[in-house]
Amino acid sequence: MKVSVDKDACIGCGVCASICPDVFEMDDDGKAKALVAETDLECAKEAAESCPTGAITVE
């Protein structure tokens, strides 16, 4: 699955990094970033579904 984060939509709540720390972390600007471009981890989907702004895409 391909993972991406829309930095403009991200509000920096950190839910994704809490749910799936192997895939997401918060950058120096307080925004989420994907640590990997692709993953098979189901938590990436859960993080995308939990994102309050829909900033995470998992395809």
Curated annotation (Swiss-Prot):
Cofactor note: Binds 1 [4Fe-4S] cluster which readily converts to a stable [3Fe-4S] form.
Entry keyword annotation includes Electron transport: yes
GO molecular function: 3 iron, 4 sulfur cluster binding; 4 iron, 4 sulfur cluster binding; electron transfer activity; iron ion binding; oxidoreductase activity
Disulfide bonds: C20-C43
PROSITE patterns: 4FE4S_FER_1, 4FE4S_FER_2
Sites where the protein binds [4Fe-4S] cluster: C10, C13, C16, C51
Keywords from the UniProt entry: 3Fe-4S, 4Fe-4S, Disulfide bond, Electron transport, Iron, Iron-sulfur, Metal-binding, Transport
Start and end residues of each 4Fe-4S ferredoxin-type domain: 2-29
Cofactor: [4Fe-4S] cluster; [3Fe-4S] cluster
Highest taxon of the lineage: Archaea
Pfam families: Fer4_15 (PF13459)
Keyword Transmembrane helix carried by entry: no
Role: Ferredoxins are iron-sulfur proteins that transfer electrons in a wide variety of metabolic reactions.
Descriptive protein name: Ferredoxin
Native organism taxonomy: Archaea, Methanobacteriati, Methanobacteriota, Thermococci, Thermococcales
